Amino acid sequence: MSGHSKWHNIQGRKNAQDAKRGKIFQKISHDLYVAAKAGGADPSANASLRLVMDKAKAANMPKDNVQRALDKATGAGDVKFEEATYEGYAPGGIAVLVETSTDNINRTVSNVRNSFNHHGGSLGTSGSVSFQFDRRGHFVIDRQSHPDITEDQVMEDAIEAGAEDVQTSDDAFEIFSQPADFAAVEGALTDKGYDLAESEITMIPQNPVEVPEADQEKFEKLIDELEDNDDVLAVYTTAD
């Protein structure tokens, strides 16, 4: 269905964060991890991974960083990693999910807890906020990259590819799928010539809320500190 899209606002915040080189590499590392975890570390047999590796090359990401992300996903190398997801609340009552992959679970939980405590948040228990999110495949087509494309055409192609929802705005088309259909939808869209500005499995908040102005600074500092943690793969919030 068509609907209001907040991709432009979200993208603006992402662009500001990605001004730091490390943020760009962290995002690519996360996408490498997710793609390799889902479909293996061989890019010739994993279209999703191949696309992310192209992004890594374009960003001049060091090969060691790429290999580290793949090793985390596949369990290769001398160091073994385990996944853990932490849930809590940021200032203003904003729900936060923190996905991690770590070789030292005690270090990671301590660092995550300290980040919450230092910035006015609180680390909760498993299940305390995850019910407020839905895991979905998420694809973005920037309308500037496809100026002649119509909403009806995108809708038809997305549904044919196996997507479950399409939202439109002046800036972009957003396409959503079930996680199990992610690779098939991504492959079908790229085969049709779409340049995907975003292509990821993510957590979508069911009811986004505004961050109270009085809590904005603490909220941003908490999220920035969590994202700067080397063990953190991704941070999701219910912030609008």
Curated annotation (Swiss-Prot):
Q: Which GO MF terms does the UniProt record name?
A: DNA binding
Assigned keywords, A-Z: Cytoplasm, DNA-binding, Transcription, Transcription regulation
Cellular component aspect of the GO annotation? cytosol
Give start-end of the signal peptide.
none
Q: Where is this region: Disordered?
A: 1-21
The GO biological-process annotations, alphabetized, read as: regulation of DNA-templated transcription
Alphabetized Gene3D superfamilies for the sequence: 1.10.10.200, 3.30.70.980
Cellular localization per UniProt: Cytoplasm
Primary site of residence: cytoplasm
Q: Which SUPFAM superfamilies match?
A: YebC-like
A Pfam family matched in the record: Transcrip_reg
Q: What family is reported?
A: Belongs to the TACO1 family.
The name this protein goes by in its record: Probable transcriptional regulatory protein OEOE_0768
